[in-house]
């Protein structure tokens, strides 16, 4: 597990890559990441974001498969189900 500070640093660096159109994940194959993810997941950050199809967290933060645990919700209203998902991720990862 990495610190919250390190996770935020990785997200900010990824967002800078996204904004500057210099993604590292659109240039590499996710194939090498798929097999390990069939066994387990180990995301470094939990993201609560908008359901808007124009705002996928993995792309905006330039992260690969399994790097983020993403909960998406419409209307900026967090219901018990989203809170439960966040609690699950905090306890699990």
Where do the protein language model's features map onto the residues?
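Conserved active-site and cofactor/substrate-binding residues in soluble primary-metabolism enzymes
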Residues: 2, 6, 42, 55, ...
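N-terminal short beta-loop-beta anion/metal-coordinating cradle
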Residues: 26-66
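Short HxH-centered metal-ligating active-site micro-motif
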Residues: 4, 59-93
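Divalent metal-coordination and catalytic microenvironments
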Residues: 11, 47, 71
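Fold-independent oxyanion-binding glycine-rich loops
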Residues: 14-15, 21, 50-52, 73-74
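Long, non-catalytic terminal segments
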Residues: 1-38
């Amino acid at each position: 597990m990495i610190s919250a500070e390190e996770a935020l640093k990785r997200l900010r660096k990824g967002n800078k890559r996204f904004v500057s159109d210099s993604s590292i994940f659109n240039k590499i194959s996710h194939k090498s990441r798929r097999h390990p993810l069939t066994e387990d997941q180990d995301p470094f950050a939990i993201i609560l974001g908008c359901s808007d199809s124009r705002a996928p967290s993995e792309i905006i933060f330039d992260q690969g498969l399994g790097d983020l645990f993403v909960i998406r919700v419409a209307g900026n209203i967090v219901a018990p189900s989203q809170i439960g998902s966040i609690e699950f991720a905090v306890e699990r990862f």
